[in-house]
């Protein structure tokens, strides 16, 4: 999975079918986002909304995973990140299916009256603390501009009755997010706890909520096997994306 085998661009991350430049974005491409983009359920999806799109990674991954009739919209508050996400989308094979909006999700409205079968977000999760080097990075890391209650409210305004709202969070913050979501009328439908190996405790959790009640399916994913190779589960989930897998 190393990118060192070939002379690849250094200002971003090269996947099998697209490139994500992220040098103008506060938060870079990482495993959390890749897991979320590969994991989110897509059955019956016709419209996707990516909240807090950053470089556009999730929008691009969902465009790759879905059919030509699926429209993906990405909303990003930061002007530089939104511009780079738009450039990444335009350079991809799915330029005609991805729209990037530079806007505050609290005020944003879709260009057409519609709701989304899938809403996805890799949200900030740090409470305000030690200042970051730039205000752009503070916005991406801290919940001051997009707290979790507001995120849940915004998702509720845009989702279909049978739709899924998917996030990735640290386990402890994810558990608190679940309780907040339930108090606001959401139902947890899918949960995958992610650990580095089978012997280590989970450090991230992938969550899918719906306005509609139903059975909750839970499982666990180890990224690496006993010999530190990528596990079968991780490989099966991400091999359509990682360049050297």
UniProtKB/Swiss-Prot annotation:
> Can you cite an annotated GO cellular component?
cytoplasm
Chief subcellular location equals cytoplasm
As its record notes, the protein acts as a catalyst of:
adenosine(37) in tRNA1(Val) + S-adenosyl-L-methionine = N(6)-methyladenosine(37) in tRNA1(Val) + S-adenosyl-L-homocysteine + H(+)
Indicate where this protein resides in the cell. Answer: Cytoplasm
InterPro entries referenced in this protein's UniProt entry, alphabetically:
DNA_methylase_N6_adenine_CS, SAM-dependent_MTases_sf, Small_mtfrase_dom, tRNA_Adenine-N(6)_MTase, tRNA_adenine-N6_MeTrfase
Q: What is its EC number?
A: 2.1.1.223
From the UniProt record, give one GO term of the biological process aspect: tRNA processing
Query: Which UniProt keywords are present, listed alphabetically?
Result: Cytoplasm, Methyltransferase, S-adenosyl-L-methionine, Transferase, tRNA processing
GO MF term list: nucleic acid binding; tRNA (adenine-N6)-methyltransferase activity
Q: Which domain of life is it from?
A: Bacteria
**Stored PANTHER family:** TRNA1(VAL) (ADENINE(37)-N6)-METHYLTRANSFERASE
The family annotation for this protein states:
Belongs to the methyltransferase superfamily. tRNA (adenine-N(6)-)-methyltransferase family.
Q: Which NCBIfam families match?
A: tRm6a37MtseTrmN
Its annotated function is as follows: Specifically methylates the adenine in position 37 of tRNA(1)(Val) (anticodon cmo5UAC).
Please identify the protein, giving its name as recorded.
tRNA1(Val) (adenine(37)-N6)-methyltransferase
The record lists the organism as Klebsiella pneumoniae subsp. pneumoniae (strain ATCC 700721 / MGH 78578)
């Amino acid at each position: 999975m190393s990118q060192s085998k070939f002379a690849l661009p250094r200002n971003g991350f090269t996947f099998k079918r697209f490139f994500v430049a992220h040098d103008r974005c506060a938060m870079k491409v990482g495993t959390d986002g890749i897991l979320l983009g590969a994991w989110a359920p897509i059955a019956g999806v016709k419209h996707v909304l990516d909240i807090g799109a950053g470089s556009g990674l999730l929008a691009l991954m969902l465009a790759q995973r879905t059919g030509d009739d699926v429209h993906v919209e990405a909303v990003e508050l930061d002007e530089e990140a939104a511009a780079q996400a738009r450039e990444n989308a335009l350079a991809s094979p799915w330029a005609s299916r991805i729209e990037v909006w530079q806007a505050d999700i609290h005020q944003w409205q879709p260009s057409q009256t519609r709701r989304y079968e899938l809403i996805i977000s890799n949200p900030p999760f740090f409470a305000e603390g030690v200042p970051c080097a730039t205000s752009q990075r503070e916005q991406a890391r801290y919940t001051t501009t997009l707290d979790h209650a507001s995120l849940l409210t915004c998702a509720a305004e845009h989702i279909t009755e049978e739709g899924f709202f998917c996030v990735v969070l640290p386990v402890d913050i994810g558990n608190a997010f679940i309780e907040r979501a339930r108090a606001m009328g959401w139902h947890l439908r899918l949960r995958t706890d992610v650990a580095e190996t089978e012997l280590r405790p989970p450090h991230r959790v992938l969550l899918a909520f719906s306005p509609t009640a139903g059975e909750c399916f839970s499982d666990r994913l180890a990224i690496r096997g006993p010999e530190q190779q990528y596990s079968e589960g991780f490989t099966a989930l991400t091999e359509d994306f990682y360049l050297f897998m």
